[in-house]
């Protein structure tokens, strides 16, 4: 474990490149939002996360404060169960150039801005046209994220070990709303047809950027995250 005084009280926390080589465990103190931020911070590095729930919502952070020391002792002794969870990689492509790159544990969402009406989102899976959704947005979620925003929008619950990605429309203007589950080897492409900056990309509900018309959001499975 490495604790540096200069990060105590820092609003920016610990940068990914500052996590020392050889780190064997990252203890996350907080709620699910803290865990999501930590997952993105160490994405691509095979360092298990040890999440302890100090927040209000602890769906992913199942270890309570009372369980901290007994569970931590098990983890240090190598007796703790480690669960692999697949993450998502998303890119924003504008005029043929990548202008944004993100990692997500839960989901990548293309949605409307506050004052926008429904937006049109052309959707492709492995270069094959699926549909143009006229909706408030589109959620691309991992199995972990299937119990988050996607569930609220009527998406299915996927077991964390399932090798799949879920595509869930948000309030689509249609008589039937059916989420689509595709293999995690698929490449999903969403083309925003919303004029101006009426569409917005959100990653794990925490970070994102505005999209302009004809921006392409390309999503695929990326690295594994390991949690206790």
Pin down the residues of each PLM region:
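Short glycine-rich anion-binding loops that position phosphate/pyrophosphate groups of nucleotides
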Residues: 32-34, 57, 144-146
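N-terminal glycine-/serine-/threonine-rich phosphate-binding loop
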Residues: 4-44
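Gly/Ser-rich helix-loop-strand patches that form or flank binding pockets
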Residues: 37, 41-59
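Catalytic core of DAGKc-family lipid kinases
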Residues: 57-136
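Short gly/ser/thr-rich secondary-structure transition/capping motifs
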Residues: 8-13, 122-124, 170-173
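Gly/Ser/Thr-rich active-site loops/lids in small-molecule metabolic enzymes
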Residues: 132-136, 140-176
């Amino acid at each position: 474990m490495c604790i540096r005084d200069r990060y105590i009280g820092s609003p920016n926390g610990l940068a990914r490149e500052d996590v020392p080589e050889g780190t064997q465990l990252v203890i996350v103190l907080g709620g699910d939002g803290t865990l999501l931020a930590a997952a993105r911070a160490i994405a691509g590095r095979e360092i298990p996360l040890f999440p302890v729930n100090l927040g209000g919502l602890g769906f992913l952070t199942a270890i309570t404060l009372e369980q901290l020391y007994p569970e931590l002792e098990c983890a240090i002794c190598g007796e703790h169960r480690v669960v692999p969870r697949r993450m998502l990689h998303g890119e924003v492509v504008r005029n043929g150039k990548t202008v944004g790159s993100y990692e997500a544990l839960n989901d990548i969402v293309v949605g409307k801005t506050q004052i926008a009406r429904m937006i049109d989102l052309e959707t492709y899976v492995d270069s094959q046209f699926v549909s143009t959704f006229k909706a408030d947005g589109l959620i691309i979620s991992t199995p972990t994220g299937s119990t988050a925003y996607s569930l609220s929008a009527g998406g299915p619950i996927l077991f964390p070990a399932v090798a799949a990605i879920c595509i869930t429309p948000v309030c689509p203007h249609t008589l039937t709303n059916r989420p689509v589950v595709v293999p995690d080897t698929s490449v999903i492409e969403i083309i925003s047809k919303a004029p101006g900056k009426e569409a917005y990309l959100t990653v794990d509900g925490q970070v994102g950027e505005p999209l302009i018309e004809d921006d392409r959001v390309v999503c695929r499975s990326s690295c594994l995250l390991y949690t206790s």
